[in-house]
Swiss-Prot record:
Protein's name according to its UniProt entry: Shikimate kinase
EC number, as in UniProt: 2.7.1.71
Binding site for Mg(2+): S15
Source organism (scientific name): Desulforudis audaxviator (strain MP104C)
Keyword Disulfide bond: no
Amino acid sequence: MRNVILIGFMGTGKSAVGWRLARILDRPFLDTDSEIERLAGKPVRRIFIEDGEVRFRSEEALLCRKLAVPRGLVVATGGGVVLNPENVANLRAGGVLIGLSADPEVIYQRVRRKKSRPLLRGNVRARIRELLEERAGAYDVAEFTVDTGMHSLPKTVGLIMEFLKERGYLEAGSDSESGGVPELPDISR
């Protein structure tokens, strides 16, 4: 059973949509940033400060390699995961890529008070626009994209469900029986 992989810029709702989608599909939910935090024993912000973005991206790439195998998960990725073509190939090998997008102002309103975003230093509004410009086209690898600024959470999830059904990604009897996140294999770097 293929993973449903949510990609998109920070603040587009990947975690919220992923959690709700996982509940509806009765599948385990995995947030890659949370998993990296769990494995590193510290928040993403501290990883960036203490170890650097390169270390974070390395951990992210390792996790993407583990996700190359279909496990029936709903996965919310970090916003920069698509910057590494190997990550995209691994995620695509194990699942279907669903993009979430939003207008820069919508993103700003969602993230402006969050201090945990290591890439948003200084003028947050300007930094969002700068990062979106740098990543222009990077999220186009998604098979289907929903603008979460234009739709409510339930509507966004509904649109994704329709797409998954139309494309045959939802198989009869494909619901998860474990209820938890399957153990990801320990692979060497």
